[in-house]
From Swiss-Prot:
Source organism superkingdom: Bacteria
Entry keywords, A to Z: Antiport, Cell inner membrane, Cell membrane, Ion transport, Membrane, Sodium, Sodium transport, Transmembrane, Transmembrane helix, Transport
GO CC field: plasma membrane
Keyword Lipid metabolism: no
Cell compartment(s), UniProt: Cell inner membrane
Family as reported in the entry's similarity comment: Belongs to the NhaA Na(+)/H(+) (TC 2.A.33) antiporter family.
Lineage: Bacteria, Pseudomonadati, Pseudomonadota, Gammaproteobacteria, Thiotrichales
GO MF annotation terms: sodium:proton antiporter activity
Positions of transmembrane segments: 10-30, 56-76, 91-111, 121-141, 150-170, 174-194, 206-226, 254-274, 289-308, 327-347, 355-375
Name listed for the protein in its UniProt record: Na(+)/H(+) antiporter NhaA
Length: 383
């Protein structure tokens, strides 16, 4: 990771944090009525019967986040072809660690929440916000070796793959087979353009990807799946910076960290304290998310990394101390934007959403703070 990209990740993390803080301030000020317009102003896209009519909040969650998952898909494709995921030996341990880091928070959440009304939130504490995590890693500078950062990114990639699968399988509320079939045809068209006709014009995939996204929204499947599958269809050429996948990934990166994620954070992190008592911190859904993110994530990921290192099944782990592995396991508990996103998909009750937001913010802050402390002050030999 070059110096300029490190600066981008650092600045992006600070902007993301500032956007979330601003949302909370605005939603608890005289400007709260303007913040509420995110859910009252509707925007239409389409013609005649082919129309998507959603409020601004949904456009952010269904539109901008689809672009974010397009970017994630491009990253994953690159890593599979030429990066760390291209070698099986490099991915087994991070993949298992990511799965454990998904399962443990979910089990903790379910052990605390038995009410059928809130069980649907089991996946909320299972996510990792890679943007925030990279921002903290950038703050730590040379205290975190490049290989250790790569391990965090690899775990986060598998976490993202799991999140996409969870959203597609568990948070699809209704299904139109006709729209889904049409969306699939546009995906197939992109594959044909790539594999058979060898078309390298990015605009072709942008247009076909847009129609795939449109059909996916109309089908009831969440639009992020269209963004991810579109990315997998876009041509990638090794050592060719001008190939569509490389070009789009490089072009999207600043938009993701400086605009899309901050806008998402601002739109979804605005906790309103009006009518909320301190007791909301001790509600089962809030506690399930806090303990899932702060305890479940670190327990699931660190236990796998430490055990595999001890058994010498994790060669890369031999370069790191257990404290370093524990520090990054803590950082993976920063769920923030991804956890908020799943929370919005799972519930629409205002009180539950406020409890979710508080749980996500507290759990993420605890994970980020203690992860930073461990890696910055407790680890004595970062080399």
């Amino acid at each position: 990771m070059g110096a300029s990209q490190k600066n981008q990740e650092l600045i992006g993390g600070l902007i993301l944090f500032s956007a979330a803080l601003l949302a909370i301030v605005v939603n608890n000020s005289p400007l709260a009525s303007y913040y509420a317009m995110l859910e009252t102003i509707n925007v239409k896209l389409g013609i005649e019967n082919l129309v998507i009519d959603k409020n601004l909040m949904h456009w952010i969650n269904d539109g901008l986040m689809a672009i974010y998952f397009l970017y994630i898909g491009l990253e994953i494709k690159r890593e599979i072809i030429v990066g760390t995921l291209s070698k099986l030996s490099n991915i087994i341990t991070p993949a298992i660690a990511a799965f454990a880091g998904l399962a443990m928070p979910s089990l903790i959440y379910l052990s605390i929440n038995h009410d059928i009304k809130v069980i649907n939130g089991w996946a909320i504490p299972s996510a990792t916000d890679i943007a925030f995590t990279l921002g903290i890693l950038a703050l730590l500078g040379t205290r975190v070796p490049a290989k250790l950062k790569l391990l965090v990114i690899t775990i986060a990639i598998f976490d993202d793959i799991a999140a996409i699968a969870i959203i597609a399988i568990f948070y699809t509320k209704s299904l139109s087979l006709l729209s889904l079939s049409l969306g699939t045809l546009f995906i197939l068209a992109m594959i044909i353009c790539n594999r058979i006709f060898k078309i390298n014009r990015s605009s072709v995939y942008v247009v076909l990807g847009f129609f795939a996204w449109f059909c996916t929204i109309k089908s009831g499947v969440h639009a992020t799946l269209a963004g991810f599958t579109t990315a997998l269809c876009i041509p990638f050429r090794e050592n060719d910076k001008d190939s569509p996948a490389n070009f789009m990934e490089d072009s999207l990166h600043p938009w993701i960290i400086y605009f899309i994620l901050p806008v998402f954070a601002f739109a979804n992190a605005g906790i309103s304290f009006s009518g909320i008592s301190f007791s909301i911190l001790f509600e089962p859904i809030t506690l399930g998310i806090i303990w899932g993110l702060f305890v479940g994530k670190q327990l699931g990921i660190f236990s796998i990394l430490a055990v595999f290192k001890k058994l010498k099944w994790f060669k890369l782990g031999e370069s790191f101390s257990n404290l370093q592995l524990y520090g990054i396991s803590l950082l993976c508990g920063i769920g923030f934007t991804m956890s908020l996103f799943i929370g919005v998909l799972a519930f629409n009750d205002t009180h539950l959403l406020n409890a979710i937001k508080i749980g996500v913010v507290v759990g993420s802050v605890l994970s980020g703070f203690f992860g930073y402390i461990v890696l910055r002050f407790i680890v004595t030999n970062p080399s």
